[in-house]
Amino acid sequence: MSEKKGVKDAYSIKTPEDSINLYRSWASTYDSDFAKQNDYRSPIEIGKYFDKYSNHKDTPILDVGAGTGLVGECLNESSREIDAIDISPEMLNIARLKNCYSKIIEADLTKRLLINDNHYGAIVSAGTFTHGHVGPDVLDELLRVTKSGALFVLTIHYQLYKKAGFDKKILGIEKSITKPNFHEVSVYGNNPDKDHGSD
């Protein structure tokens, strides 16, 4: 019987191969063992702020690091075209069953994506720009695949915003984007993982 996976395992990831291996074994229980048990709220917050800032031009939408489709579920009522992209085929198989997405894309976000320039009207992402997962350089590729004026609604782990260079990256691309709005949100609700309740 395998040990239950958790936030500590996710934060220990070092390479894309680590991600593939972790989520291969975690996919079938991710929603119950992690999201439900920890009252994982980031996808809900993404949905809330997407509704706040979006307009009819923000389509199609790309859910970056979509995993099992938790963000897609929060956007599903928007009736807009949403595609999911993730490195884990097993996680994407769970997302596919939720019928939230028009297209499922298996890809490594640290490499050039097989997506045309200026295709998407919005990017959403929860829990991807965090320890061991995806760093700030991925923003360049996401800018390539989005239209001018595209809406980005992302969570970035607060401990990494400066440490991993997200602040410098955003400063470096500021001529290509509108002034960002920052909101501090709770990642977890009332029952978080005991080691990461303050994330």
Describe each model-derived feature in a short phrase:
Residues 178-199:
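Class I S-adenosyl-L-methionine
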Residues 149-157:
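Conserved beta-strand signature within the Rossmann-like core of class I S-adenosyl-L-methionine
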Residues 113-123:
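A short acidic, Gly/Pro-enriched loop at the edge of an enzyme's catalytic core
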